[in-house]
Structures are given as structure tokens and as C-alpha cells.
Amino acid sequence: MDPIFVFFQAFDSGLLTTIAIFIDKYMAFIMLAMFLATYAATSDKKSLTLFIVNMVVSVLVLSIAKGLIDLPRPCTSMHSKIACPADASYPSGHTLISTGGALATAGNPLFPAYLAFAALTGISRVYLGIHTLYDVAGGIALAFVSYAISKQALSFYTKEMRIEP
């Protein structure tokens, strides 16, 4: 097994476990809070639209990747700090979504906080024992792919429809 995964598995912190489980259970609500905070911090409709489009594209990319790759989670053969989810391991969906949310807010005053949250999310997935570092890296890489697709789609849509976001 990956030595970084083994290192994180050996580490045990009550506070980190609590934070990681909170992120695991409430990711959808956290992303909604990120959107509302972004909405409150900016009046730029284009960046808000990009955030929403990127979340939708990220979920689609995640579904396709998990269906195509279908790798078993490390917790199917090793101990984890929470119950082992039944879906595929690669890529980390929580990491993809949180990184995608951060990318969509680049230029926003809240971007550094979102980026820190994305990093914490990735670490928490390995710490809980439900993803490997490769799963997290795949989530980050696919977040960039989703972001590029979202920006291109939004640009095409606004040009073709002559819509001012």
C-alpha cells in the first residue's frame, strides 16, 4: 500500500477525525454555503454562473470517471475511520467538487479560504482511509478539466446567445 496512505492511517486525532467526518457528511451543505458566501462577496454574475455550471459539470465528470475506472476503495481491504462507501474509489468526488468550487472562485476575496478548504478536504479523504493519494490527485486533476469545460461552455453560451452575464 502507498506509504503516504499508511502514514495517514497511523495518525489519529480526535479533532481531525471530527472535521473529516463533518466534511464527509455535509459536503453538499458546505458547497451551498460557499456559493452563498460567494454571492454575498461579489456582484459579478458571471463568476456566480461559472460556480453553478462548474458544480454541474464536476458531478457529470465524476459520474463518468467513477463508472469507467471503478477502482475498489482502500477501505475494502484495510481499516478505515468510517464505514467504507460502496462506490468506486477513483477519483475522490469530495476533492473534485471542493477543488472545482475553489477554482470557480479564483479572483474572489474568499478564494484563499476555498483553496484551503479544498486542501483540507483532500487530506481528510486519505486520513479517513476511504481514498488513496492517487484518488485525491485524480479528483484535483479532474477539477481542472471540469473547470476548463465549464469556462468554455459558459463562454460559448454567452457568445452564441449574445447574453450578458
Task: Give the ranges of each region predicted by the language model.
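N-terminal transmembrane-helix/juxtamembrane module of multi-pass inner/ER membrane proteins
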Residues: 1-31, 62-87, 161-165
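Alpha-helical transmembrane segments of integral membrane proteins
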Residues: 20, 46-54, 110-113, 134-138
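Transmembrane-embedded, aromatic-rich helix segments that form part
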Residues: 31-34, 136
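Membrane-embedded catalytic cores of phosphoryl/pyrophosphoryl-handling enzymes
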Residues: 40-41, 78-165
